[in-house]
Amino acid sequence: MHYIKTEFMDCSRLNVQRRAEVHDLFIKNIDKFQLIYEVDKYLFSHAGVYLEWTKKYEITLEELFDFKKFLGGRWNTLEDVSYTRGGWCKVGSCVWADIRESVQNELPVMFKKQIVGHTQMESKPYITSRIACLDVRKCFILDTETDEINEIS
């Protein structure tokens, strides 16, 4: 986010020397990016969408699906970082949430499951009936008919 909106908080992995160059690249290709994506009632996002965060700012899922429009006026809501990650919020935004937040916070019920990353797991993905964190440096395939997630070897 700090490359798309230069006002966004500076965070780890920010390359200040190349910020302007990468920012221009993102802006020229902004139509190719999405905050969330849905396939067959599965919701994909970087870190997860929690009802606590959407209710706090009265954000609708429709708004999140329109990334360019969302950036036009609500981008600062993406800066919410939870206590779990050293921030000041109960739950993080869809770019900052931590999978551990899924234990105590509600997920939108209109989806079969959320597929997320952002929280590096040791060796195995974290998969429940409602959310799957697949950030283990491996590739997976989701069968939307059987709800099975399998590692691709």
Regions found by a protein language model. Name each.
Residues 51, 75-76, 89-90, 95, ...:
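Polar low-complexity intrinsically disordered regions enriched in Ser/Thr and small residues
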Residues 1-80:
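Active-site neighborhood of divalent metal-dependent phosphoester bond hydrolases
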Residues 45, 69-70, 83-84, 89, ...:
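Generic detector of intrinsically disordered, low-complexity, polar/charged segments
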Residues 76-86, 148-153:
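Low-complexity, flexible helical/coil segments
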Residues 15-33, 82-112:
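Alpha-helix-centered segments that form part of catalytic cores
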Residues 56, 74-77, 82, 95, ...:
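Residue-level detector of solvent-exposed, low-hydrophobicity positions
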Residues 95-152:
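Conserved beta-sheet core of the metallophosphoesterase superfamily
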